[in-house]
UniProtKB/Swiss-Prot annotation:
Top class in the EC scheme: hydrolase
Protein name (Swiss-Prot/TrEMBL): Ribonuclease Z
Function as written in the Swiss-Prot or TrEMBL entry: Zinc phosphodiesterase, which displays some tRNA 3'-processing endonuclease activity. Probably involved in tRNA maturation, by removing a 3'-trailer from precursor tRNA.
Tagged with keyword Magnesium: no
Organism: Macrococcus caseolyticus (strain JCSC5402)
Keywords: Endonuclease, Hydrolase, Metal-binding, Nuclease, tRNA processing, Zinc
Catalytic activity: Endonucleolytic cleavage of RNA, removing extra 3' nucleotides from tRNA precursor, generating 3' termini of tRNAs. A 3'-hydroxy group is left at the tRNA terminus and a 5'-phosphoryl group is left at the trailer molecule
Source taxon at top rank: Bacteria
EC number(s) stated in the UniProt entry for this protein: 3.1.26.11
Complex formation: Homodimer.
Pfam families, per database record: Lactamase_B_2
Protein family according to the UniProt entry: Belongs to the RNase Z family.
Amino acid sequence: MKIICLGTSAGLPTKERNTQTTILSLNPLYNEYWMFDCGEAAQHQILHTSIKLGRLTHIFISHLHGDHIFGLPGVLTSRSFQGGQDKKLTLYGPTGLKQFVDTVLTISCSHLNYPLEIIEIDHGDEFVINDIEITVGALKHGIPSFGYRIVMPDTAGNLIKEKLIAEGIAPGPVYKEFKLHEQVTLNGKIYNTKDFKTAGKKGKKLVFFGDTMPCENEVSLAENADVVVHECTYLDGDVELSHKYCHSHIDDVLSLVSSGSVKKLIINHVSNRYTTKDINRLLAEINTKTECEVFIADDFYEYDIE
């Protein structure tokens, strides 16, 4: 699995950065992509990658500001011609998202050749998709804004075939029973299958935040996360100014990941006032202030989730 940042700019695109779009590639667990926000020209950014729109199955919108949704009409309509025919797409987002999509498609006389479901979300909503758990949390911004906590399913350990053979259990269909179940009864004997497996892995916890200033719900969403993708429009300067515009300051974000024991922080939604030189300097300073691994994403940054 990997996270791919297709757009990382705050508010407006720049020559180096597009507006907000993030992809979660679920390969090899599932052969599909999820998108978090869909900024202007998102489909153009996709052309620079190996991502296939036909394998995009779910889009999660944090809020309805233009830099997070103006790419939707292009992505939705182009998907019809890029392998998406007859493949359902589900769109999640705040109240008003359905009206936005319906209006754009109607006025432009656009017709999709696949089923589109639009689910308008609220705080505390929970969904399960392919055994992946999604929790929605309300944030604090100028308009309703949400974060999404994604918990991947646990993965079972691998069979230790040598142990089974040593126990006199020959390879065959029974091995599948040992892999799937906690106990197996064979020839009148009960086996605890954990004795014949390597240790399993806990599912990764990933959190994708929309625009927000500090709020209580952030803390519960981020708790013990393996990866947090968080806006940080203000990488330095006046904390109060960032809150005036309902955005996060770097001090806010570092406090969040510290209190939540977050392992990896990916910063996006970077103000266009910061040059590449500024970002490199600030990142070096940031990494002296936290034990969490921090990276300020640029467009097409990829992070492998092991």
